[in-house]
């Protein structure tokens, strides 16, 4: 019901619903003061009349606010149970192509638009883990590194992986249906998941390049996936540009930094991100490797890509 270009209530759509803009409250933008803590919260916490500031609307919005980008020639990947990949734009990108590719336009900070696509993520692995002997992430990754590369590939966003009774069986069935050997060992499953996610990321980066008004020269990874070194290297290899990691706690950082901006600690989003970059002591950069091998793998991925 909001016009993405004017950022105001869309009178035409409201009229179709028999409503008027006056029926709704004033929209609050990120970085604006909403008020102060209620008297009840003040009493319970002893904090007093602390100002309450609007942040970037929800977890992903706050996480993207904390992406340590240096310029607009970057894409971001919020990597966790789900993956959200996109770019930050000054204007919404609304076209037949963006509709066809199923990208959304979501409000960001300082009037920006988050043009993004939802992708599957660690959901695949999380649903497999209960079916295996108890293993930590380090053990899972070590087992994957020992296995043959690109033995089995899947479309992580295929409908059959949305909520199957058994994720391992769903992966096996997909592989059989596409003429591939099904994973048998834990390491083969993990490698299949990581390589397939990385190749799906390449597919989405190529979609973004069709929509983006500027070149995409690097990908920033934030969220829990920023700590997954194997997946990040696979991603750099697949997309052919450097992958740079931000914080695994980007949602909390973005939330706090918008409050800091309201308080005058920083004046702009560029200052905010410069402060975040200077504070990161665990950021890593992954350069693309084995480009020809991964180009061949991408062709195989496309050949077995099915919606199922």
How should these model regions be labeled?
Residues 3-11, 15-16, 39-218, 227-251, ...:
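Active-site core segments that coordinate phosphate-bearing ligands/cofactors
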Residues 5-6, 30-34:
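Short beta-strand to alpha-helix junction loop
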Residues 14-31:
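A conserved helix-loop-beta module that forms one wall/lid of the active-site cleft
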Residues 29, 223, 247:
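Small/polar loops that bind or transfer phosphate-bearing groups
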